[in-house]
Regions:
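Anion-binding (especially nucleotide phosphate/pyrophosphate-binding) glycine-rich loop
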Residues: 1-47
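Phosphate/pyrophosphate- and phosphate-bearing ligand-binding catalytic cores of soluble enzymes
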Residues: 52-127
Length: 127
């Protein structure tokens, strides 16, 4: 996505795990949470065997929490996550200090989506 200039998840670069686990925990890093780009989550209700789709507002996202981690824990298997990424109207989030520091060191004042992702990867790789 980042390589094709689709924005929204660049600050989440290099977070370990799977796409299906991302909404369970509402993963986040460097000023961005996955709930900001999730359009819907689809999966199987393990009690009925039926597929169900939850729209973003039905996922009860909170800080590192969601309906899949609480009410539906061990009752719902996530099979797909639909994201809404942006290209032309994307607002770069460099509010996290470490990202700004890396970009300043590289003399980047108007970063691209790729440059923010690269900065996040550099920060994560240095830990």
């Amino acid at each position: 996505c980042v390589q094709h200039n689709w924005g929204g998840i660049e600050n989440l670069s290099l977070i370990p795990g799977t796409v299906g686990a991302a909404p369970i925990q509402n993963i986040g890093a460097y000023g961005v949470e996955v709930k900001e780009v999730i359009k819907s989550v689809t999966g199987i209700d393990l009690e009925t065997g039926l597929f169900r789709t939850f729209l973003n507002h039905e996922c009860a996202f909170e800080y590192r929490d969601s309906i899949f981690k609480s009410k539906l824990k061990e009752k719902f298997f996530i099979s797909s996550v639909t994201l809404t990424l942006t290209k032309k109207t994307h607002r770069i989030n460099t509010s996290y200090g470490a990202i700004n520091d890396v970009l300043k060191q590289q003399h980047i004042t108007t970063p691209t989506i790729q440059q923010v992702s690269d900065a996040v990867i550099q920060i994560r790789s240095s830990k």
